[in-house]
Amino acid sequence: MTSKTRKVAVITGANSNLGLNIAYRLIERQSADVRLTLVVTSRTLPRVREVVELIKKFVATQEDPCSVDFDYLLVDFTNMVSVLNAYYDLNQKYESINYFFVNAAQGVYDGIDWIGAVKQVLSDPLEAVTNPTYRKQLVGVKSKDEMGLVFQANVFGPYYLIQKILPQLSKGKATVVWISSIMADPKHLSLQDIEMIKSDVTYEGSKRVVDLLHLATYKQMKSQGIHQYVVQPGIFTSYSFAKYLNFFTTFGMLFLFYLARLLGSKWHNIDGYKAANAPVYVATLINPHFEHQEVKYGSASSRDGMEYIETTDIDKTGSSDVLAYIEKKKLEWDDKLKDQITNSRIPI
């Protein structure tokens, strides 16, 4: 009996709708002779257990699936000691890593401006559910590490971890996938405020930083045998705003999503499974020596819901500034984190 090919995939934010569907699609794309270890990350152990059970149920529905093992990281990307502990765990357990999905999507939301929402929906319903201006975000929120919280959660924390595990990624000829957004417009980021301390659009701004960081680093990553891509999942139902919606507003949101797609919006995937198309596409289907890395790969859907991949160009203005800022901060934290590793492992 021949041994199975072992692969390791790390999925950050695996307990989200998108993260869970990335796991599903990644499993589907593996042949039966693969033994895939899924390393799911979350801030809490109960969420890890919940995700693992859901993935196990999915595997049970598949015909001739690959073998799937489970591991986990308890990591809070807004806590650099926690990030360092995650590195320590990965470094101790894995010689090579084949996939790394950066699905960090933290925001500092403060509800919905309902008057603004009604006005935008009435004046431009398609724009209202593509680039909403009525989501209220807090300004000036910092982490305990004194960084812009959303910047640290969505950009710097994951980047720092990736830099620490470069040997494992290189040995695994890994694909690194950064999840960006269709809302990552250059107007949402000031290069004088890269941590977005003064910004009221920190989520969108953080995804713009992701775009620029990718453009500034993918060639250097490729020189180490690591193929890095940036993708966006389009518009889909997520859990981040559920607490601000009731039954009627949720129904209204879904109605507008389907209406937008009917009117020709290719980005309204609605379903988390379709949203996960682009992340897994770049990780498993493309020829890394042919596909372009300087563009953003997007999950798209036709009017009747047929999924496909659409690429968009990325404005590279500011990419060198972003890299210089983040590299300087990385050196600062290398010094701060000396002798800071602790053990957070608990059996699942």
Swiss-Prot record:
Q: Which residues form a coiled coil?
A: none
Top-rank taxon of the source lineage equals Eukaryota
Pfam assignment, any one: adh_short
Keywords from the named record: Lipid biosynthesis, Lipid metabolism, NADP, Oxidoreductase, Steroid biosynthesis
Q: Provide the top EC class.
A: oxidoreductase
- Which reactions fall under this protein's catalytic activity? a 3beta-hydroxysteroid + NADP(+) = a 3-oxosteroid + NADPH + H(+)
Pathway listed for it is: Steroid biosynthesis; zymosterol biosynthesis; zymosterol from lanosterol: step 5/6
Signal sequence span is: none
- SUPFAM superfamilies per record: Cysteine proteinases, NAD(P)-binding Rossmann-fold domains
GO molecular function terms attached to this record = 3-beta-hydroxysteroid 3-dehydrogenase (NADP+) activity
Q: Does the keyword Coiled coil apply?
A: no
Q: Quick one: which residues bind NADP(+)?
A: 18, 41, 47, 203, 207, 238
Q: Which Gene3D superfamilies match?
A: NAD(P)-binding Rossmann-like Domain
Please give the positions of the paired cysteines in each disulfide bond. none
Gene Ontology cellular-component terms for this entry are:
endoplasmic reticulum membrane; lipid droplet; mitochondrial outer membrane
Give the enzyme's EC designation. Answer: 1.1.1.270
Protein family according to the UniProt entry = Belongs to the short-chain dehydrogenases/reductases (SDR) family. ERG27 subfamily.
The name this protein goes by in its record: 3-keto-steroid reductase
Q: Which organism is it from?
A: Candida glabrata (strain ATCC 2001 / BCRC 20586 / JCM 3761 / NBRC 0622 / NRRL Y-65 / CBS 138)
What gene does this protein come from?
ERG27
